Regions:
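Transmembrane alpha-helix boundary/anchor motif
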Residues: 59, 140, 195, 199, ...
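Membrane-interface helix caps and helix-loop-helix hairpins in membrane proteins
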Residues: 38-44, 121-129, 173-185, 234-244, ...
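Membrane-cytosol interface segments of multi-pass membrane proteins
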Residues: 1-168, 270-272, 279-282, 302-344
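Juxtamembrane membrane-interface segments at transmembrane alpha-helix termini
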Residues: 55-56, 170-176, 206-209, 227-231, ...
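Short glycine/serine- and small hydrophobic-enriched flexible loop segments
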Residues: 62-66, 146, 198, 202, ...
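Loop-centered beta-sheet repeat module
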Residues: 158-203
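Alpha-helical transmembrane segments and terminal signal-anchor/GPI-anchor hydrophobic tails
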Residues: 184-193, 202-285, 289-297, 303-313
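C-terminal ends of transmembrane alpha-helices
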Residues: 29-37, 166-180, 224-237, 292-294
Length: 344
């Protein structure tokens, strides 16, 4: 097979923190554009969309493959990962649902608990923290995905079969239980991104060369996403199914990740990398905090569609995340530290 010069998948690992930073910034901008009536917002949605989400999930799957390759202990894996996610989620979700459900909307303590434990998401479609629900579910299945792709043999065939099953399940749920599917569609349609991330993780870990099929698939998927997104958001023509945009966006993410990594390598700007890494380091916290604040500010008379309000909210979210990240890192180290052996 033809190789794209000497380019290997390891470039994604080298620029992983930068890509995390770019992904979360693009998500924050996307969430503003969803509410804005500006023409530029529609163009952004069509050309960029929520591509930061599949980038984030692909990078997460890739990172988990590295982590388990270096330390195959399931106990250590779950301890570290769950602590890393659950500590910030517990803090943000408790405050969010207490303020929103109990204080502002007066729904009571039961609704508060349902919100924190994702019951409202699955039953009512309250999708504020759907991303965390997906991450936790993917953690459960990750060891199986790791074993599936670890050997490197027939991995592309395995990937195709697995993705076909996932897509088929999406269609079946859509037809069988449309209301329930509507509640969790945003989560279900992102599962392929994580699976692809684990698949790519094996290639990154073993520094495999990037071959031409990668570019063909990514270009076709990216082109399909932009076409259908432009038709929907600019021309007002709905695609046959929203899944075309969701899955096309996943392939578009593959294209952007590789292109951005190559550009970042060529530019090699320490300043730019520091900025990207700054946001990348707090990407999980920033995702949770900004969607929480965005939701609450609308309920108290400060619509997030207002650019000034949104900018203030983002600045506040970054400040909160800075402190939250420090606490999270401290707690994670304390809770995951191995006990020191006492000399006999």
């Amino acid at each position: 097979m033809m190789e794209t010069n000497a380019l290997t998948y390891s470039v994604l690992s080298k620029r992983r923190n930068d890509l995390f930073g770019i992904s979360i910034v693009s998500i924050v901008i996307f969430h503003y554009c969803l509410l804005s009536k500006l023409a530029a917002a529609k163009v952004y949605i069509a050309l960029v969309g929520s591509v930061g989400v599949p980038i984030f999930l692909i990078l997460s799957g890739m990172g988990l493959f590295f982590s388990m390759s270096r330390n195959p202990s399931l106990k250590d894996f779950y301890k570290k990962r769950l602590v890393r996610v659950l500590i910030p989620y517990a803090i943000v979700s408790v405050v969010h649902f207490l303020v929103r459900y109990v204080i502002i909307e007066g729904k009571g303590f039961v609704a508060f608990l349902k919100g924190v434990f994702f019951v409202e998401f699955f039953t009512q479609g309250d999708s504020q923290f759907w991303f965390i629900a997906l991450v936790l579910i993917m953690y459960v299945f990750f060891p199986l995905l790791f074993k599936l792709f670890k050997s490197g043999k027939y991995n592309f065939l395995k990937l195709c079969i697995l993705l076909a099953v996932v897509v088929a399940c999406n269609f079946l749920l859509m037809k069988a239980v449309p209301k329930f599917y509507g509640n969790i569609e945003v989560m279900l349609t992102r599962i392929p991104s994580f699976i692809i991330g684990v698949y790519i993780g094996e290639k990154v870990y073993n520094k495999r060369p990037v071959q031409w099929p990668y570019w063909v698939i990514a270009l076709i998927g990216g082109g399909a996403f932009i076409y259908f997104a432009l038709m929907r958001n600019v021309a007002g023509v709905k695609p046959p199914t929203s899944l075309l945009i969701r899955y096309g966006e996943t392939l578009y993410a593959l294209l952007l990740m590789m292109v951005l990594s190559i550009v970042l390598e060529a530019v090699n700007s320490k300043g730019l990398s520091k900025v990207c890494a700054f946001f990348g380091g707090m990407s999980l916290e920033l995702y949770m905090v900004h969607v929480s604040l965005r939701s609450i500010m609308g309920l108290i008379g400060f619509p997030a569609s207002n650019a000034l309000y949104y900018a203030i909210m983002v600045a506040l979210a970054i400040g909160i995340c800075f402190g939250l990240q420090k606490f999270d890192n401290f707690a994670t180290k304390k809770l995951t530290a191995k006990p020191k052996k006492v000399a006999k």
